[in-house]
Amino acid sequence: MIALLFGEAITIFLSTQSKKREVVDFLKELNNLLGKDDFDIDTDLILIRKRKPDDEEHSTPFTLLDLDYDAWDIVDRLKELTVEEYSESKIDKDDLAPPLLFVFGKNISGKLVYIKLKIKGDQKKRILCVSFHYAKEPMTFPYA
């Protein structure tokens, strides 16, 4: 959502807290998809690798390079996610099918990594990982 404040446009991200049961169900579905025999990392995991020239350290490409990670390392970290690492849910203003993005914070090599993802599709489900980068702000964990 974009709002005007003193004549300047600012972007507002709508945040909510999913119920614990919803997070558990999301993680079960995520692990089922990642554990399928026919899981194809090239088509079943969509990883957004957008650079942030104004904040490179908090971008997915920088974090992957710093951790020496590839897509399979991300899959391994996604399989490890727990309810206790859940932080919040955000409304995906760019794609309302489904509208919720689940946000997790995971300690990797002594640094907090911000992970934002959702599961898309009806017949053929895919994992959309919008963010996998070092956390810019402190995170809260309602179920820790």
Language model features by range: what are they?
Residues 119-144:
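Enriched for short, Lys/Arg-rich terminal
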Residues 6, 11-21, 25-98:
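Compact soluble domain cores
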Residues 79-126:
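Functional cores of ribonucleases/endoribonucleases
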Residues 69-72, 86, 114, 134, ...:
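Sequence-level detector for tyrosine residue identity
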